[in-house]
């Protein structure tokens, strides 16, 4: 419903060879309030992937946005936990499904939209 909530469906491992394409995909966030990364298709993340996600989170946060995750595999989330990313982003931004994340993003409200 809110045009400022975006969902991206990722597939394949997020490791050093894929981080360039990952970063390029989110080069223009425009007026994105909440970016939901559906991670069901991402079996693993390495330290380069964690760093790319952290940079994306920082960019969104600077503009008042939120990075959210849906359907993340346990192994990928464990890597994010080891890298400190779950603590930085917040456990409240991890969801079982994209639908749940979208509902929550819209419930939280959008600073760009009239309330």
Label every model-predicted segment.
Residues 1-115:
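Structured cytosolic domains appended to multi-pass membrane proteins
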């Amino acid at each position: 419903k809110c045009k400022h909530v975006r969902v991206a469906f990722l597939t394949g491992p997020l490791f050093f060879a894929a981080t360039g394409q990952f970063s390029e995909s989110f080069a223009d966030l425009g007026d994105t309030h909440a970016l939901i990364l559906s991670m069901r298709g991402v079996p693993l993340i390495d330290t380069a992937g964690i760093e790319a996600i952290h940079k994306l989170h920082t960019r969104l946060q600077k503009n008042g946005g939120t990075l959210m995750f849906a359907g993340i595999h346990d192994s990928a989330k464990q890597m994010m936990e080891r890298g400190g990313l779950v603590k930085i982003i917040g456990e409240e931004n991890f969801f079982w499904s994209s639908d749940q994340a979208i509902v929550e993003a819209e419930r939280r409200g959008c600073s760009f939209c009239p309330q």
